[in-house]
Amino acid sequence: MSAVFTALAALVAKGDRLVSSRGLFGSCFVIVDEILPRWGVETVLVDGPDLDQWRAALSEPTAAVFFETPSNPMQELVDIAAVSELAHAAGAQVVVDNVFGTPVFSRPLEHGADIVVYSATKHIDGQGRVLGGAILGPQEYIDGPVKNLIRHTGPSLSPFNAWVLLKGLETMDLRVRR
């Protein structure tokens, strides 16, 4: 959850607007529906597969867009390219939680997303040995606000847990395909 929270907190501030799909893992939903609004971020929720709802919600300036595809637990699919196009027209950065898509089957950055987050605990580790996450995005984003949040709020892996994740990556392709 640290990856999702850090990725979003690095993009939005008090007075900003976030548009998110409703179809989210429970803790992700709490971040966008309860935690960020307490800090003055306006959150607008839409049904992920419904492009008309995205279009309507993105008719106003927006700082960020967030969705999972496939979503957890409903496995709803969001059109990454279409939502990214709408979001960019509204001035928003697109954050995709690709935990179920995995980098084996889905590469959101190739379809217009700006930032991708993963729960490393699931498919990257594959064994449930490590709690962790990953954030992928432009170097200036990672080196700037993401690094600042990680350094000062603590969601970083130990060297051993990073090594365990590397071991999981060695077999991830085989595991997710079978």
PLM regions: where:
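Conserved PLP-enzyme active-site core in the AAT-like
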Residues: M1-R178
